[in-house]
Amino acid sequence: MKNRQNFLKKFEVRQSHVPRFNEECGVFGISGTKDAAALTALGLHALQHRGQEGCGIVSYDGNSYHSERKFGLVGDNFTKKHSLDKLKGKIAIGHNRYSTTGGETIRNIQPFYADLHGGAISIAHNGNLTNALLLREQMVREGAIFQTTSDTETIVQLVARSKKKDILNKIIDALMQIQGGYALSIIANGTLIGARDPLGIRPLVLGKFKNAFILASETCALDIIGAKFIREIENGEVVVIKLSLIHI
């Protein structure tokens, strides 16, 4: 009995040594409604458990992008009307940050925005890229300048460097070069785009609210606004939504 107790003690797993499960960021996107920013804020509120370090929303009004990124919780930053009034447009994406890579700085809070050749892009990303450091080092040697320490910027840089002609194919070209788990909600040239990694490691669902289509990390973000769940985005799938039209 004593030997058995010693054996069990040797392999005892202490709670303090077990890594906590963290959802690691939440993403949301919606296209086709004048209330895009407000509905994005509600969706992020439902996804708050996925990240509490910071939150952000980027909207597009047909001509310009509008961005608000803050430290703290969604309820502390996006419940007042004046905050949402700045975020005009029928398309919006949002992000709750739980830092998996990069430090606690406002620059690392998403969605990121970049004005690229071929069109502007804003991106919200949940996941970890296993080859991000390698790609980053390679691009820095070739002259790239990074503004953040987040692996998400690696995707933006790859899109910027792509030789493809249009922004959608630039994004697909970038996705072909990254490894790891990811779920993306992107605005590019007035279009909402969703993408999920080939293994489906990170969740991403498609929903509909009236005439608007929605991308979200979980169905709870659909439930809070009364949206209908359509299906999960499939492994390795890229979905393109332009206002109320969807192309797969």
Q: Over which residues does each language-model region extend?
A:
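Conserved short alpha-helical segments that host acidic/polar catalytic motifs at enzyme active sites
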Residues: M1-L245
